[in-house]
Amino acid sequence: MAKELSGYGPTAGESMGGTGANLNQQGGNNNSNSGVHWGGGSGHGNNGGQGNSNSSGSTSTVMKTGESYLTPWGDVVINNDGLPVMNGIVMTEENSTLVDNPFGGVSRVLNSLISDMPSLFAESSGNNNNNTASVNTAPTNAQVSDMDKSSKVVSNVINEKQKQKNKIATQISEKQKKIEEMKKVFKHHSYHGITDLERDVDELQKKSNQLDADISKLNSYKNTLQSKIGDVNKQKEAEEKARENAEVAEHETLNEEKQAVAEAEKRLAEAKAELAKAESDVQSKQATVSRVAGELENAQKSVDVKVTGFPGWRDVQKKLQRQLEAKQAEYSAVENELKNAVSFRDGKAAEVKEAEQKLKEAQDALEKSQIKDAVDTMVGFYQYITEQYGEKYAKIAQDLAEKSKGKKIQGVDEALAAFEKYKNVLDKKFSKVDRDAIFNALESVNYDELSKNLTKISKSLKITSRVSFLYDVGSDFKNAIETGNWRPLFVTLEKSAVDVGVAKIVALMFSFIVGVPLGFWGIAIVTGIVSSYIGDDELSKLNELLGI
């Protein structure tokens, strides 16, 4: 069994990909000389690539050219040939040895350093495979929390060695005092009692000097850890700032496009209102033209019917003619007004069409950005899975998402039976501490953030999701972790997916991966739940990856 502590701290093995998820070994198995065994975690990992492992819980990771990890005796860098280099020297079976380090792990170290500082080491690990760089060492980008834990462990080791040094100093002082007392009694200084004490003092002084060297080396290692913690914190701050800036820019872009849609909708509403008003004006003027046309027709008839033979008939005829001409002028005027109103109405109709086109363009732009945002979310999700748990795990997650599209939901009993079989083996792999950590993470869920993730992931899968189901799923998930009864969660998932299918379950459960720090085993449970709805093939892949 690989020891728990690595180059950075008690949990540093777990920092290399969530308790060993991305840990793998290339070429062959652990009992051969063909593998490249760079480092191990705390017993949760498995081996992948082209080989397999017969080790009892040890984990390993393939490190890339140029990567390095930290040991108490300096950095180990992987050269272009994939070999470990310390102090500029390629470590081989002849010039280096795997030894227990002071913190409970195992490291490959140059023999010259072992001879220089023997008291830092326990005994050899018994495995000096020249392809083995180190066991239980963490890469330099290990999490700050792990490095901080290791720094505290180093401090404890330093304190312990200082206590040993103080004890030795007391012993030296006591023996020197006895020597002085004996010299007063025995003038012949070659008296064997004196020489024995002097020899003891010399041996104790050598141990004290060695402890000084150890303490100096450990202080240097501690300072290096603290420096790296600062560097990692700065890098994390810079990355977080860049991420925040990107999110702000993306948010601003979406806000601008949402604003553009809102403005286009407002303009369309205004244009339609103006068109309605113009249409009403046209109808009013049409009624006026119709009325004046009737009056003009009557006036024309009055003129056409000439009645003569009474006094003043000529004056009457002239008056009727003037009335006709007035109506003709009025008709011409209202007819022109109608033409203008119709032209104005047609212009407003054109404005409505233009506003509708502008709205469509704004909506298309917003839709495109939202889709891009959703795609970016999934790309970021797979990248996160890759960084935390490895490419194989990310590939499984991607396969689950793709295979869920269009897949109808199966019965609760069938999916639950598949999951229970998987979970029964999984339960043996993680402890109550792991289970409590998952429960606590689910206790502190930010459902506002989770709902945003659900919306984006759902959009990328081209489905719609009700945010309300998140609360039910989160509650049932938490209760299942606490009680071991998973049926209520599967019932809730089936209810949520009855209209859309398995893609809804993927969206819901992946939202928890993105938004909740579930840890490696929490993610293993989530992907196991989703896989149980997809099929045995996906569960088999997951089992193989987890080594169960």
UniProtKB/Swiss-Prot annotation:
Example of a GO cellular component annotation carried by this entry: host cell membrane
Skewed-composition ranges (Gly residues): 37-51
Positions of region (Disordered): 1-63
PROSITE patterns: CHANNEL_COLICIN
Record keywords: Antibiotic, Antimicrobial, Bacteriocin, Host membrane, Membrane, Plasmid, Transmembrane, Transmembrane helix
GO molecular function: pore-forming activity
Transmembrane segments: 505-525
Pfam families: ColA_N, Colicin
Localization: Host membrane
Biased composition (Low complexity): 21-36, 52-61
Record GO biological process: defense response to Gram-negative bacterium; killing of cells of another organism
Family, as annotated: Belongs to the channel forming colicin family.
Job description of the protein: This colicin is a channel-forming colicin. This class of transmembrane toxins depolarize the cytoplasmic membrane, leading to dissipation of cellular energy.
Protein name: Colicin-K
Organism: Escherichia coli
Gene assigned in the entry: cka
